[in-house]
Amino acid sequence: MASPLLPGPPDQRRNLDWCWSKLPSDLMQFVFDRLGFADFQRAKSVCSSWLSVSRNSQPNNQIPWMIRFPKDNNHCLLFNPEEEDKMYKTPNLGNDFAKSSCIASYGSWLLMQPESEYMEEDLDHQCNNLYILDLLTRERINLPILQPEFGLTCPILWTDEKSKDHLVIGMAHEELAISFKKGDSSWKQIPTLSGIEECFSMVFKDHKLYCLSNYKLKVFDFSGDIPVKVFKTSVSKLLNNPLCISMRMRLPGIPMKDQLNHFKDDMVVTLAGHVLIVKCHRPSLSKIWSFEIYKMEGNNNKWEKTVSLGDETILLDLGITVLAKDMQGIKANSIYFSNPTPYFKDQYDENEIFIFDLDSNTVEQPHRSVSSSFPRSRARWFLPCFKRESYFLQ
């Protein structure tokens, strides 16, 4: 009996090639719709019939990508952890893209806000409007002019790929929550969100808005016409109120900004809908961030420290967790985060993107080629949503 590992006769090999190229298109589309981005690109190059089927399919991406924003550039760079040695470059995203910062994302959509130095220009000029941009198709939706001098804080972006509905929520100042959704002509106050003063972290998941302040965690249900508060609990004993705390005694000859202890608290909603409080800390004169995670246990409103996320991983920029089991290039029980305090740069903030391994309590950086490309450029993690018309990455 011939070994199945040995190549068959030429005619048999030709028949095998013919079988691969003549698979039913509905079966091939079923397969293509379940491939990640890297495998999708490889599969469509197998033969002309596979390429044809791929045009009616799109990758099913569950892997977080990194986006880098080179300073004063109208393009950005994308890194797929599945492909360690490759960076994708987007084409020109517009002149005002270089003058704006990404303040939130949902799928492949970015919420862009003008940099502070451009805020005081003519408000009628388009580059001073907030806008949302699909990074992969370049589809753009301009938002109404926002009057507050410092723009939108605690921003939230949500989109629906099928209906093209979109929702933007944020704080215009410490006591005023505003929103804009598809069909609106202007920003609207959300009076039912009163009582979220000093909110510094928001997450929108499954039509619920989670609001975290120094004192309270509140949850609002957005599934109806009017948001309804469905949960409230105290967090005042858990959080660090100040973002940065200076050393008690200043060291001579060292800039004051290098002597700051950096603190930041964030909120994360897990796949199961549990709320986590993530406490970040970087000591003065140090490059190393450390993290503590707290989870509310039961109905007793008590927060307990947790050291394991199981098969999940935190995407701190998005305030969510994703399933990381069997995901190539993604580590389970880790925190993927960008610099939590970008406005307090010092000589120890050499990098903008990190991975914290909860098993070893160590901070790692992505692949060397990513970390060395455009150092000190802004970066964040996001979950791209690939569409059939979005394959123009270089």
Curated annotation (Swiss-Prot):
SUPFAM superfamilies on file: F-box domain
Chain segments annotated as coiled-coil in the UniProt record: none
Residue stretches making up the F-box domain: 17-63
InterPro entries assigned to the protein according to its UniProt record, in alphabetical order: F-box-like_dom_sf, F-box_BR-signaling, F-box_dom, KIB1-4_b-propeller
Listed Pfam families: Beta-prop_KIB1-4 (PF03478), F-box (PF00646)
PANTHER family, A to Z: F-BOX DOMAIN-CONTAINING PROTEIN, OS07G0183000 PROTEIN-RELATED
Stated name of the protein: Putative F-box protein At5g66830
Organism in which the protein naturally occurs: Arabidopsis thaliana
